[in-house]
């Protein structure tokens, strides 16, 4: 966005903050605690567990290619990554802190004041710049070089089995016996149509 261009300093700072447990009340929970890198920056569990061992109502969404999403959270309640990053800090089930306390901890830190100065030319760290840095990092979480991406660009070939899977994925809903009809909702190249669907599951 126009008010938060990506910079090398901002992305690097955002990555540090994403893995920083100081953002939680007791210093045990970071963004990465639920958005796990090994699982596409998502939580493989049905419900994510927060700072006090409490379970949330949903699990942490995948962040890969999140830069292309205009509505965030499972209910679309956030309009951009900056807006979304405000929420977990003060959520009593997630990180259960206050922005005043988090800002004070970061301002008193041995490294963060200089890093925020380099990224945003500010002398006092506050919530607005914390979420801007995290959002910058999240916009760099891009998967664009998988085998499917390379095939889509005409750079490699898929195996016969993979091509059969692609055909099944793209069979139209009028003939369920012939395939899976995935593509209507999981639309290439991001494998989402960026809308919300009721699939009948709680």
Predicted regions, residues:
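Short glycine/threonine-rich turn/loop motifs
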Residues: 1-87, 149-202
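Short alpha-helix boundary/capping motifs
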Residues: 42, 91, 109, 144-145
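Periplasmic c-type cytochrome electron-transfer domains
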Residues: 51-139
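Amphipathic alpha-helical substructures
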Residues: 112-173
């Amino acid at each position: 966005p126009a008010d938060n261009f990506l910079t090398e300093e901002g992305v690097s700072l955002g990555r540090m903050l994403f893995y920083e447990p100081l953002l939680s009340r007791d210093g045990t929970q970071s963004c990465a605690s639920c958005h796990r890198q090994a699982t596409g920056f998502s939580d493989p569990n049905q419900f994510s567990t927060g700072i006090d061992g409490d379970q949330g109502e949903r699990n942490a969404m995948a962040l890969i290619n999140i830069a292309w999403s205009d509505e965030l959270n499972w209910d679309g309640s956030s309009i951009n990554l900056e807006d979304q990053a405000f929420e977990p800090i003060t959520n009593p089930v997630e990180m259960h802190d206050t922005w005043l306390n988090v800002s004070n901890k970061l301002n008193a830190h041995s490294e963060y004041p200089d890093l925020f100065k380099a990224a945003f030319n500010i002398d006092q760290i506050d919530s607005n710049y914390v979420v801007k840095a995290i959002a910058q990092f999240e916009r760099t979480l891009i998967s664009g070089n998988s085998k499917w991406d390379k095939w889509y660009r005409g750079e490699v070939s898929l195996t016969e089995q993979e091509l059969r899977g692609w055909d099944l994925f793209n069979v139209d809903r009028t003939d369920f016996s012939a395939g899976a009809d995935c593509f209507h909702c999981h639309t290439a190249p991001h494998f989402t149509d960026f809308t919300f669907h009721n699939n009948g599951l709680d």
